[in-house]
Amino acid sequence: MASVVLALRTRTAVTSLLSPTPATALAVRYASKKSGGSSKNLGGKSSGRRQGIKKMEGHYVHAGNIIATQRHFRWHPGAHVGVGKNKCLYALEEGIVRYTKEVYVPHPRNTEAVDLITRLPKGAVLYKTFVHVVPAKPEGTFKLVAML
């Protein structure tokens, strides 16, 4: 009995392999062309932002004059210089503009600067450019002291 069942199974397996496959089972692919994309090279033709130094070393500035515009701190504020919302530097008093290179000591709460300092080799010093305005008129002198 078992041999008859085994013979029937093998016979059906062989006939299913040798029988022709139906036409619906065959997949036929024809050549096709995908439609072109609609991307364009937009932008890249805009003019520059005109950032940089507006007042050079030795120029006379009035209070409120913009000294430099910048995206990131390339120049740092010094004496009598303020910082705008967009990191532009402006004069707080009228006087003459001076640029100096000074040792940069970051605030301890500034984590990015502290991480940079700790990655430097021992004994290395960071120098940054600072912008100062030297006031034109001397700061208050006491007349009573001059009268003595």
UniProtKB/Swiss-Prot annotation:
Membrane spanning stretches: none
Cellular-component GO terms for this entry: mitochondrial inner membrane; mitochondrial large ribosomal subunit; mitochondrion
Which UniProt key words apply to this protein?
Answer: Mitochondrion, Ribonucleoprotein, Ribosomal protein, Transit peptide
Transit peptide feature range? 1-30
Subcellular localization: Mitochondrion
- GO MF annotation list: RNA binding; structural constituent of ribosome
Protein known as: Large ribosomal subunit protein bL27m
| Encoding gene per record | MRPL27
